[in-house]
């Protein structure tokens, strides 16, 4: 025969399980966002728009949110304020982001903001669009006009890649290897990676 102690312990476990599944259901059915991270020119915005249309989600480009808030282009913010100030602005924008059923394309430097990344991981599934350095170099024509954050004077793209790749891997819930994939193949791969 079960004692009151065993019954209350069982109820407490059951209660925790119900809470867990309630949160899980909320995250998967109400707030399931897809957060795209990766190097500049990895296709976050381009693939993100098409993915959003394909699965019926909204689309948010956090770089555009920054530009709208600051009333300047990214490259102008970086040039006038410096890389560290830009990273602070970017972290504040991404850390305050609220979305439901959206694809969110982030800036390549979003991974420098630990608080923002924790928040984004709570908002949805973080997908790293992984490209080889050679492919990034091929795609990225004008690094200055793109508003790419270089934290050190004279930093090369190879150094930037080496610095960021481990951060993308650290925060990713899923990784899509994009080398050799066309736009539609990339979109299908992202959808598969998040179970859509």
Q: Which residue ranges define each predicted feature?
A:
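Post-Walker A helix-loop "phosphate-sensing" segment adjacent to the P-loop in P-loop NTPases
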Residues: 53-62
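ATP-dependent small-molecule kinase phosphotransfer cores
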Residues: 61-110, 114-121, 146, 167
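A glycine- and Lys/Arg-enriched "phosphate-lid" helix/loop adjacent to the NTP-binding pocket
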Residues: 122-166
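NTP-dependent small-molecule kinase module
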Residues: 26-29, 50, 54, 163-196
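Walker A/P-loop
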Residues: 45
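Short, positively charged and aromatic/hydrophobic N-terminal segments
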Residues: 3-5, 26-27
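Hydrophobic anchor at the beta1->P-loop junction of P-loop NTPases
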Residues: 36
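P-loop (Walker A) phosphate-binding loop of NTP-binding proteins
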Residues: 39
């Amino acid at each position: 025969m079960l004692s009151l102690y065993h019954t209350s312990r069982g109820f407490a476990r059951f209660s925790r399980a119900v809470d867990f599944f309630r949160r899980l259901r909320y995250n998967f059915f109400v707030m399931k966002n897809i957060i795209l991270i990766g190097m500049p020119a990895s296709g976050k915005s381009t693939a993100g728009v098409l993915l959003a249309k394909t699965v019926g989600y909204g689309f948010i480009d956090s770089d555009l949110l920054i530009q709208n808030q600051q009333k300047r282009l990214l490259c102008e913010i970086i040039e006038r304020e410096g890389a560290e100030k830009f990273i602070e602005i970017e972290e504040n924008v991404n850390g305050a982001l609220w979305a439901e059923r959206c694809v969110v394309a982030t800036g390549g430097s979003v991974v420098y903001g630990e608080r923002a990344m924790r928040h984004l991981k709570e908002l949805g599934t973080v997908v790293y669009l992984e490209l080889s350095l050679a492919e990034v170099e091929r795609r990225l024509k004008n690094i200055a006009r793109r508003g790419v954050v270089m934290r050190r004077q004279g930093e090369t793209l190879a150094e930037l890649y080496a610095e960021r790749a481990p951060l993308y891997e650290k925060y990713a819930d899923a990784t899509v290897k994009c080398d050799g994939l066309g736009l539609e193949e990339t979109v299908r791969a992202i959808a598969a990676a998040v179970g859509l």
